[in-house]
Amino acid sequence: MNDTAADAATLDDAAAPAGRPALTRREQKEAYENNKLFKRIVRQVGQAIGDYNMIEQGDKVMVCLSGGKDSYAMLDVLLRLRERAPIDFDIVAVNLDQKQPGFPEHVLPEYLKQVGVPFHIENQDTYSIVKRLVPEGKTTCSLCSRLRRGILYRVAGELGATKIALGHHRDDIVQTLLLNMFYGGKLKGMPPKLQSDDGKNIVIRPLAYVKETDLEKYAELREFPIIPCNLCGSQPNLKRAEMKALIREWDKRFPGRVDNMFNALAKVVPSHLMDTTLYPFQSLRATGEADPQGDIAFDEEPCASGDDAAAPGAAQPISIVQFDDL
């Protein structure tokens, strides 16, 4: 069954569920679009996993769960993929309870028991440390992130996890690229897979190809018990918020622009940049032979089209899972 046939079947089923009144055309259309959303997200996550070999046979994946929409969606999709994957891997969900005032400690354990996922709650009062060290009114995100990262690395070792999965998505990656360009003066993004600072862990980002707007819709449809992210009382990261607003505006006014920016991260041409550590500019000499990559930038229209313009997440599905039944 191809995607079109599967979508049609889902729509037909939604039109007349047993024992219930037939759905209106609007409800049928919503069901159809929701089914497409589910399939798109699962496909994009599967594609990212395949492209970067994020999960391998026998892995134990530690899914870091914060209680936000992104980490809930990541866990939900990984569980779906595991059911149909041609490899065996384990999943353990981990939440770091940082003892923020008002944090609903019961929410995540109840949810994880409901879905039947092994989990571990790590209790560490990093909230008090951050509040003591960071002046009032300043953002605590940077220090909090460093403390949280160190704890999660330790927990991964204690649990025997071979991969640490974080819930960063496409928008996070593009935001980081822009932040580094505008405020750091360097071309640096957020990799889909990396070795941790201590050299002992592999960190993966299965949502790397997924748009934040899709995750927002997904979380609403799945009715995840979202925990607010502002319990710490920290001021928001204004620079990142600025980049987020910029990306949202571009997505609305210039469809495809953000996708092309994201796609560019996987199509780097060092010979047409200025980093001498990536390309031997100083030793470059005329060889007398034509170089197809020489000054091609001056000859071709820079706007991509067709296959070249496709975002990484739009590539063909990987073999980790069949999507017909999703």
From Swiss-Prot:
Binds 1 [4Fe-4S] cluster per subunit. The cluster is chelated by three Cys residues, the fourth Fe has a free coordination site that may bind a sulfur atom transferred from the persulfide of IscS. Pathway: tRNA modification. Pfam families: ATP_bind_3. Its EC number is 2.8.1.-. Keywords: 4Fe-4S, ATP-binding, Cytoplasm, Iron, Iron-sulfur, Magnesium, Metal-binding, Nucleotide-binding, RNA-binding, Transferase, tRNA processing, tRNA-binding. [4Fe-4S] cluster binds at residues 141, 144, 232. The keyword Iron applies. Its main location: cytoplasm. It is found in: Cytoplasm. A motif (PP-loop motif) lies at residues 66-71. It is an enzyme of class 2 (transferase). It catalyses: cytidine(32) in tRNA + S-sulfanyl-L-cysteinyl-[cysteine desulfurase] + AH2 + ATP = 2-thiocytidine(32) in tRNA + L-cysteinyl-[cysteine desulfurase] + A + AMP + diphosphate + H(+). Residues 1-18 have a biased composition (Low complexity). GO terms for cellular component: cytoplasm. Residues 1-26 are annotated as: Disordered. GO terms for biological process: tRNA thio-modification. Its cofactor is Mg(2+); [4Fe-4S] cluster. SUPFAM superfamilies: Adenine nucleotide alpha hydrolases-like (SSF52402). GO terms for molecular function: 4 iron, 4 sulfur cluster binding; ATP binding; magnesium ion binding; sulfurtransferase activity; tRNA binding. Belongs to the TtcA family. Homodimer. Catalyzes the ATP-dependent 2-thiolation of cytidine in position 32 of tRNA, to form 2-thiocytidine (s(2)C32). The sulfur atoms are provided by the cysteine/cysteine desulfurase (IscS) system. PANTHER family: AMINOTRAN_5 DOMAIN-CONTAINING PROTEIN, SULFURTRANSFERASE-RELATED. The thiolation reaction likely consists of two steps: a first activation step by ATP to form an adenylated intermediate of the target base of tRNA, and a second nucleophilic substitution step of the sulfur (S) atom supplied by the hydrosulfide attached to the Fe-S cluster. This is tRNA-cytidine(32) 2-sulfurtransferase. It comes from Burkholderia orbicola (strain AU 1054). The gene is ttcA.
